[in-house]
Amino acid sequence: MSGGRFDFDDGGAYCGGWEGGKAHGHGLCTGPKGQGEYSGSWNFGFEVAGVYTWPSGNTFEGYWSQGKRHGLGIETKGRWLYKGEWTHGFKGRYGTRQSTSSGAKYEGTWNNGLQDGYGTETYADGGTYQGQFTNGMRHGYGVRQSVPYGMAVVVRSPLRTSLSSLRSEHSNGTVAPDSPASPAADGPALPSPAIPRGGFALSLLANAEAARAPKGGGLFPRGALLGKLRRAESRTSVGSQRSRVSFLKSDLSSGASDAASTASLGEGAEGADDAAPFEADIDATTTETYMGEWKNDKRSGFGVSERSSGLRYEGEWLDNLRHGYGCTTLPDGHREEGKYRHNVLVKGTKRRVLPLKSNKVRQKVEHSVEGAQRAAAIARQKAEIAVSRTSHARAKAEAAEQAALAANQESNIARSLARELAPDFYQPGPEYQKRRLLQEILEHSESLLEPPDRGAAGLPQPPRESPQLHERETPRPEGGPPSPAGTPPQPKRPRPGASKDGLLGPGAWNGEPSGGSGGEGSRPATPAAAGAGRRSPARPASEHMAIEALQAPPAPSREPEVALYRGYHSYAVRTAPPAPPPFEDDPQPEAADPDSAPASPATAPGQAPALGNPEPAPESPAKLEPKPIVPKAKARKTEARGLSKTGAKKKPRKEAAQAAEAEVEVEEVPNTVLICMVILLNIGLAILFVHLLT
């Protein structure tokens, strides 16, 4: 047998034994352009046993056949290590795959390089799945057993679908803690403030609406005489448990394989005794087990999920959520049964005066419970088969370790022979492994330094800034004139300067129904002085009074009586837009007054002495006045006195009567609402009595 160095046209080279024009014996070969290296034994051009090293530093140590990995061997790829059998270049039939960083692993059968058949998946926190696999996913029947809640791993990676399988190349991926959702393996991603825990898909989540509603709700308060009639409902009916806050709800789960978070967002309706416990209150020793069907790596079909605390669900599942008919048994012994939709009980939870007949629902629930129990029994059988397959895979893994030792021996012989035949021949394999080792050290050091930097730099600041920005952008009412309830009758004098160029001041349309003002917070059509000084709404009332006291009273005019007359009826503010009053369009033959203008209605001539503060010429109707005025009762007395002294004409009297009727209509609105409420109450009573009789 001859030997030497042979260079190929593609840039590769071979140095070792040669016979019949083919590599034979021991030798070392590099790939095209010197990329990759195989060192070991050869048989007429084909590898037999040795070590193949990729430029990335990944290695395979084991046996070959017809140029493909076949037999027993160990593959090191990134942070994953496979030990076991190989068939024509693919993993299988039996083998184990383990993460060198987290300890997660799979032990069982393989097909075409994927988990297929029966096996055991052990997760980073120690939780396990034993059962069937198809095309690398949990599919069929199986048992998922979690570790105690205090030891359960916190899963933050939305990229992985399993903690230890081939379904993820991002085995050590992490996402920022402020991400909207951190999916795990036992449910879809849902927004939640909680952190997912490996293997926990059930959560004792209080229903927010039920928590806010009183337990004796309905049409009557809890202390009412007839309110106690609601206690006639049965504890075993589908609709009887709707006042309890015991609904199980998957709060935060993922499309990955092992983590669903549990968090309690509500409290019980009747205090601590009826309140559902928060997830923080779960005992650290609590564990959770699921036995049933799996489809496409998710809990789907019939199954039973149970916690060591007594929480139990039997029924149908879909995509890691309770979906279909099932029964939930709470830790306190109460049961919740009915139809679930995406983890929410949709039948029997709504508050209704007439609960639906639930015979058909109970039959479907019983059927689903029986199916779940059968599925759990089958899952236990499949788990036993998986245990036997796991033990066989472990034996193959031990044999693969022996095969790897033999392959390394062949590799060392080939390297020694290559150095003898060609001392200057470059062997890239050791350099690849050194580079990979250095890269792993750097990644490990970065992973130790990254979390504190992220937490200290960017995470705490956004939550503190966002609320303040929103508060600044939120419009707030400015400080306006004092409340009409606390304003004495005298300050209504400065009305001429109250308007502000047609702009509404604070509280101009609110009306502020205080006891002393009768809701006269603003009057849209009150005339104001054209040359009066305008003031800011934020100026104190005392300052307004000081300025107004210095104003010289102009010539007597009838506009003050018009303003007072409008202020007497507050309905114009609430029912009519800011425009001239409606009674100016109704001319009367008696109202032939040369001083009246289209913007101001007819006035009573003798009211200036009663007011004691005549106002200047009128303003346009668009100018509005936010200043509160004298209470309604006093305005009415003043108006009556003025009319009696001066002998007002028929038009103001007729308009006053119409305005009074409109005011009465406005005041009768609450009576109409009260009548409607009484009618609804009677209807509810009738329905309740019919329900009790039936």
From Swiss-Prot:
- Enumerate the Cytoplasmic topological stretches: 1-672
Bias (Pro residues): 478-491
Q: Which residues carry this modification: Phosphoserine?
A: 162, 165, 445, 447, 466, 483, 536, 542, 596, 600
Matching entries from SMART domains are given as: MORN
Which InterPro entries does UniProt cross-reference here? Junctophilin, MORN
The protein, known as: Junctophilin-2
Q: Residue numbers of motif Bipartite nuclear localization signal?
A: 350-364
Q: List the disulfide bonds.
A: none
* Oligomer status and interactors: Interacts with TRPC3. Interacts with BAG5 and HSPA8; the interaction with HSPA8 is increased in the presence of BAG5. Junctophilin-2 N-terminal fragment: Interacts with MEF2C.
Q: Does the keyword Nuclease apply?
A: no
Q: Which Gene3D superfamilies match?
A: Histone H3 K4-specific methyltransferase SET7/9 N-terminal domain (2.20.110.10)
Q: Which gene encodes it?
A: JPH2
- Recorded source organism is Oryctolagus cuniculus
Q: Which GO terms describe its cellular component?
A: junctional membrane complex; nucleus; plasma membrane; sarcoplasmic reticulum membrane
GO terms (molecular function) for this protein are: DNA binding; phosphatidic acid binding; phosphatidylinositol-3,4,5-trisphosphate binding; phosphatidylinositol-3,5-bisphosphate binding; phosphatidylinositol-3-phosphate binding; phosphatidylinositol-4,5-bisphosphate binding; phosphatidylinositol-4-phosphate binding; phosphatidylinositol-5-phosphate binding
Per the record, where are the segments of Basic and acidic residues compositional bias? 467-476
Low complexity bias (residue ranges): 176-189, 250-267, 522-540, 589-610
Bias class Polar residues marks the residues at 235-244
Phosphothreonine carried by residues:
474, 487
